[in-house]
Amino acid sequence: MRCPYCGSLETQVKDSRPTDDASAIRRRRVCPDCGGRFTTFERVQLRELTVLKKSGRRAPFEREKLMRSLEIALRKRPVEPERVERMVNGIVRQLESQGESEIASDRIGELVMEGLRALDSVAYVRFASVYRNFREARDFNALIDELDGAAQPEAPSKDDGGTDEPPAKTRAPTRA
């Protein structure tokens, strides 16, 4: 394995152990040339996945790119890295087990949205704003209303004195 510090091809494994969820092997390495220490992860790859972009272009699937986009959405949020890792592992497993070598970028985005919705609602809104290309404040309001609707208990029926009108929402004014 090439040393990320000096480029030497001679590195030594000092420690090797499975990750907590046993989906990868974590190896601690040292470079004898510069003394640099770094960690690598070895994972099973069931198949080479290709992402079919909206433009029609094809690109190799990059697990690290998926992880980076989640880290951006989850920045400064109280979510343990292990939960994010489990989510990414689950998404990759779903993609690999679909039996297709080409996956539409939309499918990946929907899986991420699904996972973030269960993980952290703020990160979900952050990711959705980029993924769905929000242009105005009302785009955020619609998504938040959708989130609120999924989290609210069932509305009272007409027999209970309820109406067909949705409950009034009080929200601070938004700045456009």
Curated annotation (Swiss-Prot):
Q: Where are the zinc fingers (unnamed)?
A: 3-34
Record's superkingdom? Bacteria
The record's free-text note on cofactor binding: Binds 1 zinc ion.
Q: Which gene encodes it?
A: nrdR
UniProt lists the family membership as follows: Belongs to the NrdR family.
Q: Which UniProt keywords apply?
A: ATP-binding, DNA-binding, Metal-binding, Nucleotide-binding, Repressor, Transcription, Transcription regulation, Zinc, Zinc-finger
Has keyword Transcription? yes
Q: Provide the cofactor list for this protein.
A: Zn(2+)
InterPro entries named among the record's database cross-references: ATP-cone_dom (IPR005144), NrdR-like_N (IPR055173), RNR_NrdR-like (IPR003796)
GO molecular function per UniProt: ATP binding; DNA binding; zinc ion binding
A GO BP term, please? negative regulation of DNA-templated transcription
Protein name stated in the entry: Transcriptional repressor NrdR
PANTHER family xrefs: TRANSCRIPTIONAL REPRESSOR NRDR (PTHR30455:SF2)
Species of origin: Methylocella silvestris (strain DSM 15510 / CIP 108128 / LMG 27833 / NCIMB 13906 / BL2)
